[in-house]
């Protein structure tokens, strides 16, 4: 019976830890989309001709402004260094989940960039 209680406690703690990291990953994906919207709004409000962003014009590790410039379905433009990156977490399961969220966010924000 003691083992059952221990198993329940461990499962509860593991679920809580996974939920916290899942929220962090979702927040990171959302912040990438918000960054794209802000950049697009700044370009649209300005009087000068907005910069033309080419879809898939930057490889992983190159400088970028918007997510759609980075090549790869789950590649995003990192918020702080503004470089294309794909890895979300060191944990393979969380990384896979985060890349899925990135891919969904990229699918939504693709209209910012022109196709080549």
Curated annotation (Swiss-Prot):
Expressed by the venom gland. It comes from the Eukaryota. The keyword Secreted applies. One of its GO terms (molecular function) is toxin activity. Residues 1-19 form the signal peptide. Its main location: secreted. Transmembrane segments: none annotated. Keywords: Disulfide bond, Ion channel impairing toxin, Knottin, Secreted, Signal, Toxin. Disulfide bonds join 56-71, 64-77, 68-113, 70-84. One of its GO terms (cellular component) is extracellular region. The presence of a 'disulfide through disulfide knot' structurally defines this protein as a knottin. Belongs to the neurotoxin 25 family. ICK-8 subfamily. Ion channel inhibitor. This is Toxin ICK-10. It comes from Trittame loki.
